[in-house]
């Protein structure tokens, strides 16, 4: 075939292929148009369409942000929560106009969201552990979130709405009207979703028919016009659907019955889901191990002992329920009493119950619950009554388990154990309970009432010891512990009534320990408690002599910590006793040991030390366990005030007598520190606390104004804080006023001795409201002790001053001369190293190697050798300060005046 025919065939094929491409494009365009209209076609043409209001759209926007905020809270993502809160606030501000236009109040779900965020932030802010566990970004976002939330609620004036919501919060599962609308919309969408599965089949059918028609069109050229007409009809149909889709419909109005029916349907669905969930779970009840005896078997001693051993074998295991263990033992005791198995088994089971009650706490360092404590106390009390009522039962730690006799009633029952140790353990648990209670609450008072029952129990234990002491079932240490417990519950209490009987009882108990105790610790503690008791009851001389004879000052440093704490408490109480008796110097010496350390509360075991970084957690726990219960505390403020008053009465006359001495000895550094601090103040107001009252009184006494000093020490405020705390307040106040008068007189005479030539005793007596005899006695004592250079003239009743001491002007002149002399000596010391043998010899004198022979340098000759201030010279010896072989005259330096 020629090329011409080939070219024609090629052209025909090209034209046919191009025509096919055009047809395909037409078909694809029509199919694409149909697909674009399919998404707008509803599942059913007759179904009504709902048009949502703008209010509902705003509700949806707010609820979406609230849901995101809840997710952020659940994930503890505070950065995301902060961003979500800002978005929520902005969205709410935009929605305000819509709500106002449609007369819609603030949505309750929005207020609920603000309350939830506020509660979450406040809870996280108060929980220190949770705050410390936050990441760096979350910890940084927490303060601004809290601040923004408070400011937003305040600026938007939402406080009332938030308060109303907190008063009447929504219950779990409660839905607000806005939530109900949202649920209705959700149900409609769900119904559409349920009907939509039929749509793909229709589309599939349409697509199948389209594919068939396309195949027919491609195969039959004659049917092309028909296919085009069908495409036009489809397009018209789709346009009609589009017009109907965008046609606005009226709102669908639902009646109340419809809403109720929807609610019921939702509830039924929820119940069905819950039932399905519950069907997957099987409830498992914890079976309690109950003690059962075989009903066919007689409960004898052997059966009961076997069952008791079986129950006690579970003691201490991890899987053992401790409360159930106690219940099992009580059940055994009931059966034993019912079957009348004898006192031996009853006492054994009772003692096992007491041990089990003590073991209810997993850690021995934790305190026992108060209810458990009272239960244990009643159990121990009933067991003690049983032991006191019969002498056929012996309970002792000296018996072994093999030596026990629980069933043979012809002999004495022997049981291993010690009721005295149980009483001692119970006393320790009471101390722990009081240590861990809030001392400023009524709960502490309620728990403190148990001390009365505890004291009765200890007295009963003492009675039991005295009844059975001859049987040899007790150890000496146990007996001493019982007496010591009774002493420790009585030594700090002031007995206003029956003081003689209480004193005799204390002497009896302490003498028992002095006699029985072979160890030193209990004897030392009994001695200190005895001294404390005597000091509280104002028996100063007996308490002082007893403490000095015990030599506790020398051995207390080698004692245990609890004994050292008791020693500190005793010394403080002894100092207060000396103050009440008017022994100011002794009181000052006793209290200074504690007050000068600036750690009075820590030394008295009334607070934990502030330097906790130096201690481990275990040491801190031990220190807290040593704390004294609050009702046994010594008033530290009272003790400090007494110490400052004693310092004032001793230090102010001493300061007046040593006014012009450069290096006077201070009796109390803390008192001087308080005076200096008050002098540094630019503006001094009226005193407020006890310390400021004493400082103001000291300044008045230094000027000789005893009345002003008295007004600062004795007034209504000081009465409430200090003087009313003494049981003999009026006597103590009278003693303090008398000492203020006497020390003010001494200070006045020492301060103004250079001013007076003679002073009338009568005038001094009238000035300080003292008797002439007292004034004469005070002045005579001052003259004898060489504190005052004067003579008493009896015919004229005058005090004649001796001009031995320089006047104030002379003293100032002497001080000035001393300072000038010191200044001159300092200048001489600075200039002396620069002078040579013949005066100033020029700059060459500083370099002896230039003007002298090498041999002279080796011999050490020359005016200056080595360093200027007498350091090592070139020959290894000290350098000369003057000419060769000469000795410089040095004057001793006098003490400086400043």
UniProtKB/Swiss-Prot annotation:
Residues 219-228 have a biased composition (Low complexity). This is Eukaryotic translation initiation factor 3 subunit C. One of its GO terms (biological process) is translational initiation. Component of the eukaryotic translation initiation factor 3 (eIF-3) complex, which is involved in protein synthesis of a specialized repertoire of mRNAs and, together with other initiation factors, stimulates binding of mRNA and methionyl-tRNAi to the 40S ribosome. The eIF-3 complex specifically targets and initiates translation of a subset of mRNAs involved in cell proliferation. The lineage of its organism: Eukaryota, Metazoa, Ecdysozoa, Nematoda, Chromadorea. Residues 888-898 have a biased composition (Basic residues). It comes from Caenorhabditis elegans. Keywords: Cytoplasm, Initiation factor, Protein biosynthesis. Residues 1-10, 24-37, 189-202, 850-859, 866-878 have a biased composition (Basic and acidic residues). The gene is eif-3.C. The keyword Cytoplasm applies.
């Amino acid at each position: 075939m020629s090329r011409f025919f080939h070219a024609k065939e090629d052209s025909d094929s090209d034209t046919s292929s191009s025509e096919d491409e055009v047809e395909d494009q037409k078909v694809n365009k029509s199919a694409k148009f149909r697909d674009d209209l399919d998404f707008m076609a509803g599942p059913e043409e007759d179904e009504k369409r709902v048009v949502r209001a703008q209010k509902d759209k705003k509700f949806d926007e707010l609820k979406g942000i609230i849901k995101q905020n809840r997710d952020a809270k659940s994930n503890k993502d505070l950065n995301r929560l902060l961003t979500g809160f800002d978005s929520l606030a902005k969205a709410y501000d935009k929605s305000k106009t819509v709500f106002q236009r449609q007369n819609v109040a603030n949505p309750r779900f929005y207020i609920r969201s603000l309350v939830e965020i506020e509660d979450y932030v406040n809870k996280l802010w108060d929980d220190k552990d949770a705050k410390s566990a936050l990441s760096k970004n979350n910890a940084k976002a927490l303060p601004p979130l809290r601040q923004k939330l408070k400011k937003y609620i305040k600026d938007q004036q939402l406080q009332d709405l938030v308060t109303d919501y907190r008063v009447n919060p929504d219950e779990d599962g409660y839905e607000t009207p806005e939530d109900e609308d949202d649920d209705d919309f959700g149900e409609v969408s769900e119904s559409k979703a349920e009907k939509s599965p039929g749509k793909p089949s229709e589309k599939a059918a349409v697509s199948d028919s389209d594919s068939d028609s396309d195949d027919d069109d491609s195969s039959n050229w004659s049917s092309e016009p028909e296919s085009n007409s069908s495409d036009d009809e489809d397009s018209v149909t789709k346009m009609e659907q589009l017009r109907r889709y965008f046609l606005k419909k009226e709102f669908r109005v639902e009646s109340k019955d419809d809403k109720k029916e929807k609610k019921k349907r939702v509830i039924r669905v929820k119940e069905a889901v819950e039932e399905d969930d519950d069907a997957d779970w099987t409830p498992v009840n914890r079976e309690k191990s109950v003690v059962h005896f075989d009903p066919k078997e007689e409960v004898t001693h052997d059966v009961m002992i076997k069952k008791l051993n079986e129950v006690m074998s579970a003691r201490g295991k991890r899987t053992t329920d401790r409360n159930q263990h106690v219940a099992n033992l009580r059940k055994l005791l009931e059966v034993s009493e019912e079957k009348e198995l004898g006192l031996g088994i009853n006492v054994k089971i009772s003692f096992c119950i007491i041990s089990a009650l003590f073991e209810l706490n997993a850690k021995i360092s934790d305190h026992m619950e108060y209810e458990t404590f009272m239960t244990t106390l009643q159990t121990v009390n009933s067991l003690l009554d049983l032991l006191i009522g019969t002498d056929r039962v012996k309970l002792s730690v000296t018996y072994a388990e093999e030596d026990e006799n629980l069933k043979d009633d012809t002999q004495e029952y022997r049981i291993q154990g010690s009721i005295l140790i149980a009483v001692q353990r119970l006393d320790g648990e009471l101390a722990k309970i009081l240590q861990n209670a809030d001392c400023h609450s009524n709960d502490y008072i309620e728990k403190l009432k148990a001390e009365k029952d505890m004291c009765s129990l200890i007295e009963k234990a003492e009675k039991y010891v005295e009844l059975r002491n001859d049987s040899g079932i007790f150890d000496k240490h146990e007996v001493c512990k019982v007496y010591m417990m009774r002493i420790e519950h009585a030594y700090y209490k002031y007995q206003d009534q029956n003081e003689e009987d209480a004193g005799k009882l204390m002497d009896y108990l302490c003498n028992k320990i002095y006699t029985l105790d072979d160890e030193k610790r209990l004897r030392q503690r009994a001695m200190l408690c005895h001294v404390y008791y005597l000091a509280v009851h104002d028996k100063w001389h007996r308490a002082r002599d007893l403490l000095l004879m015990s030599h506790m000052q020398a051995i207390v440093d080698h004692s245990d910590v609890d004994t050292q704490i008791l020693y500190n408490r005793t010394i403080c109480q002894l100092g207060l006793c000396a103050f009440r008796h008017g022994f100011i110097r002794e009181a000052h010496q006793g209290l200074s040991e504690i007050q000068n350390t600036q750690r009075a509360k820590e030394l008295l075991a009334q607070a934990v030390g502030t330097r906790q970084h130096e201690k481990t957690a275990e040491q801190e726990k031990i220190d807290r366990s040593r704390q004294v219960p609050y009702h046994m505390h010594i008033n530290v403020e009272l003790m400090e005030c007494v110490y400052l008053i004693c310092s004032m009465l001793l230090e102010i006359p001493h300061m007046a007598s040593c006014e012009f001495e450069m290096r006077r000895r201070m009796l109390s550094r803390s008192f001087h520190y308080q005076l200096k601090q008050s002098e540094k103040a630019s503006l001094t107001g009226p005193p407020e606390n006890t310390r400021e009252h004493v400082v103001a009184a000291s300044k008045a006494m230094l000027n000789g104004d005893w009345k002003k000093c008295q007004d600062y020490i004795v007034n209504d405020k000081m009465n409430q804080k200090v003087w009313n705390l003494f049981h003999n307040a009026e006597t103590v106040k009278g003693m303090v006023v008398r000492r203020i008068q006497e020390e003010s007189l001494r200070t006045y005479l020492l301060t103004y001795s250079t001013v007076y030539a003679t002073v009338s005793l009568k005038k001094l007596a009238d000035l300080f409201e003292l008797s002439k005899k007292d004034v004469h006695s005070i002045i005579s004592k001052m003259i004898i002790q060489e504190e005052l250079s004067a003579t008493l003239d009896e015919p004229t009743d005058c005090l004649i001053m001796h001009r031995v001491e320089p006047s104030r002007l002379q003293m100032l002149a002497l001080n000035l001369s001393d300072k000038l002399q010191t200044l001159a000596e300092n200048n001489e010391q600075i200039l002396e190293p620069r002078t040579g043998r013949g005066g100033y010899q020029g700059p060459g004198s500083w370099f002896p190697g230039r003007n002298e022979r090498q041999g002279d340098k080796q011999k050490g000759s020359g005016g200056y050798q080595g360093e200027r201030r007498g350091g090592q010279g070139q020959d290894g010896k000290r350098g000369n300060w003057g000419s060769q072989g000469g000795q410089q005259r040095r004057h001793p330096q006098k003490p400086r005046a400043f």
